[in-house]
Amino acid sequence: MTIYLFDGTMDGLLTAVFDAFSLKEQPEELLTEGDALPLFCERTYQVTTDEEKARRVWTGLEKKLTREAMKLISVSWLSEQKELNTPLFRYVCKVFRQGDISRNYADADVLAVTNIARKVLHEQLRMKQFIRFQKAKDGTYLAVVSPDHNVLPIIIDHFQDRFNDQPWLIYDAKRHYGFNYDGKTVIRITFEDESAVPFDLTNGKLDESVISSDDQLLQNLWRTYFKAICIKERLNPRKQLNDMPRRYWKYMTEKN
């Protein structure tokens, strides 16, 4: 049994595909460095990430797959799930051997990659629905999130289109980065010292010293409205949890 080890990056995975074809091998698994090896592992091969090799593999995929299938691969990678590594590696290898297999759901690897991508896209939709902004005194709107998957890169266009006339910051507290829009361009940002930021990473609330007084009033009005429209006789907690999972509540105004 041959196992390939890589650095956990997309370029690393694509390099592994390049090396597998160059060496004429079909490794049983693709694992990240430090993962426990299977009991009957006979040989390991350390993949050295090479951007040029990765670029050539990606260009080759673009020639064989539809735009939709390429998007599926990119989206699945945003899941950050280790169990994706081997199925996605085999999926890409099969594309070069068999052509476009993106709709062959009888193939276990295609099905695994597709299902993971669908979970990411589902959370992308939920983020668009559940993000709550707060207005700071300087006019900037802040939203803090901590999604299961790394969906910020695929939701930013939505907010740039919808709120293109106001500055905002959407920050992923789980991955310690965000996107800031100044009214013209969007840039990716990180904070050297998160303890010094003027908001609480655990619930997304702005410090009282920087939150707009108008926003405080609107938050109270929104909570009042949310309670007022509730019809006790029609409460369905199970459906509410299904439509609005509890893990999102800590950042939602109406739940705090």
Q: What does each model-found stretch correspond to?
A:
Residues 101-194:
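Internal, well-folded beta-alpha domain core
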Residues 3-8, 43, 47, 103-106, ...:
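Short, charged/polar micro-motifs that form catalytic or ligand-binding hotspots
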Residues 71-76, 104, 173, 235-241:
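Short coil/turn segments at secondary-structure boundaries
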Residues 45-53, 186-200:
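Acidic, Ser/Thr-rich peripheral helices and adjacent loops at domain boundaries
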Residues 12-23, 90-94, 157-161, 220-227:
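Short, hydrophobic/amphipathic alpha-helical patches that form generic packing surfaces
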Residues 167, 194, 198-256:
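Long, compositionally biased intrinsically disordered terminal regions
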Residues 31-128:
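Charged, alpha-helical interface segments at or near domain boundaries
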Residues 1-51:
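N-terminal ordered "arm"
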